[in-house]
């Protein structure tokens, strides 16, 4: 993808429509917007954080945006290209529940070892609490990241080994209506 091309090559559009839940027209529209916002064709972590700040002005989304950026950045080059962007957007906005849960698992599995540890989950949950700031009133049993993580692990860590497998995470998430609802938040919006 060249610098600030306003159109994608037909073969790239075709490939992205195969790999995503977007139509050819939608891929082209998203590309136009992406190039408008990122004329270089790449989005770095600072730019990604800036976007998150627009959506969460009352908290500090920096840490969470960095975690999400790292999942979007599939090839780990420190930048998100359009292909990485549109594929992640497709899963998070239009993917099946299982696809979204696999994506969320990658977000929480910070060291990519195939497990979510208590500390990894605490890092993400703490980042979420920082991001939403005081805009959300939480119940007493979840008013700190530690309490929330304790509750999640009590529910999901069936073999009590202190880490969650993808299967434990998927089953536990599906059993918690608030998690399913959160994962479905953007359905149909994009």
From Swiss-Prot:
One of its GO terms (molecular function) is calcium ion binding. Residues 24-59, 60-95, 96-131, 144-179 form the EF-hand domain. SMART domains: EFh. It is a peripheral membrane protein; Lipid-anchor. InterPro entries: EF-hand-dom_pair (IPR011992), EF_Hand_1_Ca_BS (IPR018247), EF_hand_dom (IPR002048), Recoverin (IPR028846). It holds the Pfam family EF-hand_6. Ca(2+) 2 binds at residues 109, 111, 113, 115, 120. This is Neuronal calcium sensor 1. It comes from Pongo abelii (Sumatran orangutan).
């Amino acid at each position: 993808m060249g610098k600030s091309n306003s159109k994608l090559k037909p073969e790239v559009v075709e490939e992205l429509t195969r790999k995503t839940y977007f139509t050819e027209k939608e891929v082209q529209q998203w590309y136009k917007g992406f190039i408008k916002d990122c004329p270089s064709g790449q989005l770095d972590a600072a730019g990604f954080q800036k976007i998150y700040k627009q959506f969460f002005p009352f908290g500090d989304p920096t840490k969470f945006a960095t975690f999400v950026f790292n999942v979007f950045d599939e090839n780990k080059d420190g930048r998100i290209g359009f292909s990485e962007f549109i594929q992640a957007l497709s899963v998070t906005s239009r993917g099946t529940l299982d696809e979204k849960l696999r994506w969320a698992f990658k977000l929480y599995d910070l060291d990519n070892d195939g497990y979510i540890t208590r500390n990894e989950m605490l890092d993400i949950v703490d980042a979420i609490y920082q991001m939403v700031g005081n805009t959300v009133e939480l119940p007493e049993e979840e008013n700190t990241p530690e309490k929330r993580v304790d509750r999640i692990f009590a529910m999901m860590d069936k073999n009590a080994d202190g880490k969650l497998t993808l299967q434990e995470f998927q089953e536990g998430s599906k059993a918690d209506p608030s998690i399913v609802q959160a994962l479905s938040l953007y359905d149909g919006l994009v």
